[in-house]
């Protein structure tokens, strides 16, 4: 793709963030080539950071008119992107979403634009590689990069380029984003999958590219990992209930984990009640042993524990949302409109 073709379209690069002083500088620096090669602006949509994030971004903005700091009063990522599009997206062709906790190749945005122009896709999504630094992070990364942790999700498995119905959000036509109403701001988790559901329903096409990808760093401790996946489970449940969709087979297996754990408590009455839970735990531990022996990875056993935490938290969050909605949902619940 020629530089003229790239610069013929205008891109809005949005970075949702909250208290990212440790990362935001390197993220913006990494986008320097994108600002040179593309007709693009960067909007850092900040949810009220109390560390040095805002002052760092303000410094960049004072030095470069292509960088802007924007307030996000709602603090959540879905609203961060919506408000950026509403404020700065009117004359832009493409929205590019950048995560403050990720690492990206220097030509990431350029590759996305090339793929969008070459395929005519309405959305371009990317694969995600998880990398750890601490021992627990390395174990969690091993789990998340394996079928034990991702269930064979293609955007986690390095699949070749293909048309898909969901992936890690990277680029989207502003016109498509606006037409379907942007992100649903009632979603604090799983807003990307929920938007992709509406995108597909409206007839738009999503392209998974293998020409670029991002690196993600998982949570470094047990409790943050549990909370993250508990939130993912709740978000996925809300998505299914909103669109009256059904879980896939890949999702059904971890969905059963929390009920199995509750059922195992009945072992005090009859020991056979613990068998299903024991089978699941044994399968996870066996897979971890295979990772350790078959792939000669010393973090295999700990990866099994990380996967069990993710499975249980995701399942618990899912059922918490389902049961909570059944008890609390009124006969009619209006959807909160996005701020675009």
What positions do the PLM features span?
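Glycine-rich, basic loop-to-helix element that forms the pyrophosphate-binding segment
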Residues: 72-90, 111
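A conserved acidic beta->alpha catalytic loop
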Residues: 46-55, 74, 102-105
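Conserved donor NDP-sugar-binding/catalytic core segment of glycosyltransferases
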Residues: 106-138
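Membrane-embedded multi-pass helical conduit in multi-pass membrane proteins
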Residues: 257-328
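Short beta-strand-to-loop acidic/aromatic patch adjacent to the donor-nucleotide binding site
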Residues: 92-103
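Catalytic donor/gating beta->alpha subdomain of glycosyltransferases that bind UDP-sugars
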Residues: 116, 184-247
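A recurrent flexible, glycine/aromatic-enriched loop bordering the glycosyltransferase active site
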Residues: 131, 153-175, 188, 194, ...
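Short, acidic, metal-binding catalytic loop of nucleotide-sugar glycosyltransferases
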Residues: 29-39
